[in-house]
Amino acid sequence: KKDGEYKTGGVWTMDKMGFKYGKLEVCAKFTSFQGGWAAIWLMPQERQYPSVNNSYPGEIDIMEQVSMDKIAQHSVHTHYTLDLGYDKNPPRNGYGEYRDGEFNIYGIEWTAEKIIFTVNGEETFSYPNLHLPNESLMQQWPFDVPYYLILNYSVGGEDAWPGPIDDRGLPAHMEVEYIRYYEKENKGNDDDGDEEIPEDLIKNGGFEDTFAEGKQPGVFMSGDIEWDK
């Protein structure tokens, strides 16, 4: 808090690196206090249904923790779940326990059929693709395009989800030990594997094991990533 205003922030990979399918893990710990809001989430680089104007083009909340809750919340937000109100068939959110004040691993395993959410390697929630015949209208599964990763720590307020802010909990922070991303060796496409890898990628930084070219975990951009104000 500075000059009577709350300052929050985060980082993202928008226009730097997108994720589509595979396994994504973030090892992080964060401060929990009344009014705090830690989040690890994904938004689409581009809409899967660009011709349709709706409020929710797709969102995958790998982890959200608010105030003094001792659970990590997982959610998906789509036109189907929010605009149309189908939030229980199938359920759009779930919960997992985490170790407060310690590093925990929050992840997803994402395929064309479902998204499985995990905490410390344990499955805590999953969301399936229903393959609706009118999918382009219902938009239950806008998850077949690349998404970018967002890590941020916000605070609430009287009308916000975390509720009133207790200034005694400040300053608050999120600390990230690593981000790891894995892809299946055979993704079922015609990619010949000759795609040029940008020079500003960190490949397998700090890991002792040797991985096949292009298959290293934790491949992410090394350039500065600024949170949009």
Task: Give the positions of each predicted feature.
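GH16 jelly-roll
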Residues: 1-193
